Amino acid sequence: MNSWDAGLAGLLVGTIGVSLLSNGLVLLCLLHSADIRRQAPALFTLNLTCGNLLCTVVNMPLTLAGVVAQRQPAGDRLCRLAAFLDTFLAANSMLSMAALSIDRWVAVVFPLSYRAKMRLRDAAFMVAYTWLHALTFPATALALSWLGFHQLYASCTLCSRRPDERLRFAVFTSAFHALSFLLSFIVLCFTYLKVLKVARFHCKRIDVITMQTLVLLVDIHPSVRERCLEEQKRRRQRATKKISTFIGTFLVCFAPYVITRLVELFSTAPIGSHWGVLSKCLAYSKAASDPFVYSLLRHQYRRSCKELLNRIFNRRSLHSVGLTGDSHSQNILPVSE
């Protein structure tokens, strides 16, 4: 194993560790907070988090073993199962992000009718469709024996070893990426650009009110005026930064792998194995970044984390106080005798 392989193995180990901790923390927040569970986005977050954890526990370790051993890390049946999960979880992750963007769009563009349009039942229906859509492709690949170990990515994933099936496999793979990656990307762009448009409209209204107030308040201190203008500037940039993060992480994590798969199918140019594994690692890194992008940085999840930490520390302090009380009573008893 050379330095490249060691670096890729280290990247995978780090991704596994961060993904387990962050997604596990999101699950704890969902279990702890009834307020979060009552909201429709909680179902999308739960679906995304469970998929990320399953990918972290099954697919990432097998890819790590493939990178270290430079060969298929498990038997054919286990590898086919892992390839089935890899295909399903990739599509499910992309479609779940599209569902979350639709929820944000409805919440921002139709705030008064949001509760009527996005109920828990509607969210459950969207999750069920996501599963059905995502299951279609691995089920078809399993029936056509297009699941196995792919040496270029050191992973159990979609692959075809028969040259006579190359065209059919290329069409199938293109359809899979078009109906998962491209479809989700189009939905993300449409919904978040609508959200950005509404956010900028509200910012303009607030800016007009702010400027009118500053004009009327002649005796206002210059430092207060500067703070108002700085807050106005931050308000303009806040929505743009968030939406850029949502779409940017999606592209950075998934686009290299999807493009590599398509270039592999439709080009005769050789692709380096290290780049293949790196593109797969980038796709895996989405599982580690999702909790921060969609959950843990939000106010409700931060509050739930604080409550969990307070509960843990309170239990420890009560336990230590109890132990101190027991030792104190043991020291007093012999004296009273």
UniProtKB/Swiss-Prot annotation:
CDD domains: 7tmA_GPR26_GPR78-like. Its main location: membrane. Keywords: Cell membrane, Disulfide bond, G-protein coupled receptor, Membrane, Receptor, Transducer, Transmembrane, Transmembrane helix. Pfam families: 7tm_1. The chain crosses the membrane at residues 11-31, 48-68, 82-102, 124-144, 169-189, 246-266, 277-297. One of its GO terms (biological process) is adenylate cyclase-activating G protein-coupled receptor signaling pathway. InterPro entries: GPC_Orphan_Receptors (IPR051880), GPCR_Rhodpsn (IPR000276), GPCR_Rhodpsn_7TM (IPR017452), GPR26/78-like (IPR049579). It is a multi-pass membrane protein. The keyword Cell membrane applies. Disulfide bonds join C79-C156. GO terms for cellular component: plasma membrane. Residues 32-47, 103-123, 190-245, 298-337 are cytoplasmic. Exclusively expressed in the brain. Prominent expression is detected throughout the entire neocortex at all rostrocaudal and dorsoventral levels. Strong expression is detected in olfactory and auditory sensory areas. Belongs to the G-protein coupled receptor 1 family. This is G-protein coupled receptor 26. It comes from Mus musculus. The lineage of its organism: Eukaryota, Metazoa, Chordata, Craniata, Vertebrata. The gene is Gpr26.
